[in-house]
């Protein structure tokens, strides 16, 4: 991803490409769901961290695309703007924080971290591999669709 060093990946280039692959494969735009990526600065990671991070982000974005906007909700609120956003940047201590935020129906009281679905097992495993803490909350900007959901991944400087 445009790096002369093949072991280093710039997330500002890599993560938008992960999102593009989801757009091509799952076509969320055809359902009225807009995906967006904001990585506020150049964040370079070793490939050993960047690849599992990309898989983790992909799983969280796909989960939002599949579950945050059920068809009946999109039909009921056709003028609503369905969004899934990926936001990334550095923390004060030079760690990394990434959030996947949607303005969909929300979790409805379900705690996904207690589930043993393949997706949640994958999210937990990749988080552990990265030495990261992952949390989820109801979104802070309710929409016509519901409360939304926010997943936040914090990776300490040096990761593992």
Give short role names for the model-derived ranges.
Residues 15-22, 53-64, 88, 122, ...:
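Structural preference for long, well-ordered alpha-helical segments in enzyme cores
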Residues 85-87, 94-101, 150-152:
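Short, highly conserved beta-strand within the GHKL-type HATPase_c fold
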Residues 9, 27-61, 65-70, 76-83, ...:
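Conserved short strand/loop->alpha-helix "switch" segment adjacent to the catalytic nucleotide/phosphoryl-transfer site
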Residues 142-160:
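C-terminal end segment of the histidine kinase catalytic
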Residues 92-120:
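Glycine-rich/acidic phosphate-handling loop/turn and adjacent ATP-lid/helix
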Residues 110-137:
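ATP phosphate-binding glycine-rich loop and adjacent ATP-lid/helix-beta elements
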Residues 66-93, 138-144:
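ATP-lid-like helix-loop hinge signature
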Residues 8-25, 31:
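Short beta-to-alpha transition helix within the HATPase_c
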């Amino acid at each position: 991803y445009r790096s002369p060093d093949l072991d280093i990946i710039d997330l500002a280039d890599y993560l938008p490409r992960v999102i593009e692959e989801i757009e091509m494969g799952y076509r969320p735009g055809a359902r009225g769901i807009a995906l967006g990526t904001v990585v506020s600065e150049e964040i370079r990671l070793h490939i050993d961290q960047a690849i599992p991070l990309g898989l983790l982000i992909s799983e969280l974005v796909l989960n939002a695309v599949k579950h945050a906007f059920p068809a009946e909700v999109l039909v009921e609120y056709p003028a609503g703007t369905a969004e899934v956003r990926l936001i990334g940047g550095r923390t004060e201590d030079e760690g990394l924080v990434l959030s996947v935020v949607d303005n969909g129906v929300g979790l409805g009281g379900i705690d996904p971290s207690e589930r043993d679905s393949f997706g949640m097992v994958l999210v937990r495993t990749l988080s552990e591999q990265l030495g990261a803490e992952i949390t989820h909350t109801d979104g802070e900007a309710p929409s016509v669709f519901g409360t939304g959901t926010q997943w936040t991944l914090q990776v300490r400087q040096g990761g593992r």
